[in-house]
Amino acid sequence: MGLPWYRVHTVVLNDPGRLLSVHIMHTALVSGWAGSMALYELAVFDPSDPVLDPMWRQGMFVIPFMTRLGINNSWGGWSITGGTITNPGIWSYEGVAGAHIVFSGLCFLAAIWHWVYWDLEIFCDERTGKPSLDLPKIFGIHLFLSGVACFGFGAFHVTGLYGPGIWVSDPYGLTGKVQSVNPAWGAEGFDPFVPGGIASHHIAAGTLGILAGLFHLSVRPPQRLYKGLRMGNIETVLSSSIAAVFFAAFVVAGTMWYGSATTPIELFGPTRYQWDQGYFQQEIYRRVGTGLSENQSLSEAWSKIPEKLAFYDYIGNNPAKGGLFRAGPMDNGDGIAVGWLGHPIFRDKEGHELFVRRMPTFFETFPVVLVDGDGIVRADVPFRRAESKYSVEQVGVTVEFYGGELNGVSYSDPATVKKYARRAQLGEIFELDRATLKSDGVFRSSPRGWFTFGHATFALLFFFGHIWHGARTLFRDVFAGIDPDLDAQVEFGTFQKLGDPTTRRQVV
């Protein structure tokens, strides 16, 4: 037929058997990619330090999704939460990857079978003997089956009734583990950060899907609606399917970027808004304040801050700091975090405690400014030394560390004080190994950023695809040039394949 590349899909237009075949092959490709990608990530993943080198710092993309659905262990003898295990069971990371690859192979064979045996009786209309699909009936079947799957996931997998549960954590991403979740049927179920809403919404949506599927199986659409929405045209199915996909892509781009119970920070990294709002910093100061009220010393109070919490409060873990065209995991940027140096507290010679202004998300450089508790500028690192009034040397700034590796260590020489003031702009200070991976020191985004960018971009493209195919199916007669003044009556729709010369014409 000599089709251009952008019209090749017309070969399956009136061919239900091969239409099914290419969709099975697509499923094979998706499943095969998922399994292969999982095996690749497992080959390069280092599980040795779940606190300072978690999966999201290493750029893992499919491992977090497996983990949030209840996979914890590897046949390599390690657990995602740290430590070793002896019996990971069949549903380990490798087991899930293998299952996807086996399923991919079966789909591949099924796709070939359906391509070869395309002319099946099931696809023939009994009345005409021609290939046809009862699209409203197929819609009902798919709606019913997806409703069953949705209900089953919410009622069994998430609740732990028959399944592992899902990943659940505290608001600060410290205590995450896989556990069963009870459905939240009250108003709290609509809070995107409440895991119970995942169970209840899947149960409710699944029930609705089952009922809607049964409705569409038992009730035929009215003729006027059938014709008005072009329910007999496969391109209508394409258009509405694209709409469902782009809508879902927009939704998950939002839940990923802004955060939700479905995107735990232990698996995907923190969100940019947690840096912007000082979310972890406030919790750290609250814990230190509680410790001081219990008569602990500054050193004791800061030493009790979990290293994991301090690590979240570091700008290098902000997904908005990495450029879209900086490839690679976060560890390839600022390096592999080795340890927390401790919290630096700066003081001037008059005894004021000074706080370094933190760098906003979208700055690459930022002036080093130290303010007191009232927000008054007391010291800085000046751009022009000749005009400086608040330089570290003039004000006599010193720094002392509390907690971490440098606990109790203080510095008064200006060069060292300025070094740590610059680093304090970026949040809590960590020792970073840039040699192992030859890290270049330029921040990278986390999988949270990549997922959001990819899904938002493709959602936009698919939105245009929905408009395109929706317009094509609604206005097919107009686009085909069939108008009231046409002097040859075309039996339109019998043969739609491009270049087919056999469409019957009858001169009026």
Curated annotation (Swiss-Prot):
Belongs to the PsbB/PsbC family. PsbB subfamily. One of its GO terms (cellular component) is photosystem II. PANTHER family: PHOTOSYSTEM II CP43 REACTION CENTER PROTEIN (PTHR33180:SF37). It is a multi-pass membrane protein. NCBIfam families: PS_II_CP47 (TIGR03039). This is Photosystem II CP47 reaction center protein. One of its GO terms (molecular function) is electron transporter, transferring electrons within the cyclic electron transport pathway of photosynthesis activity. Keywords: Chlorophyll, Chloroplast, Chromophore, Membrane, Photosynthesis, Photosystem II, Plastid, Thylakoid, Transmembrane, Transmembrane helix.
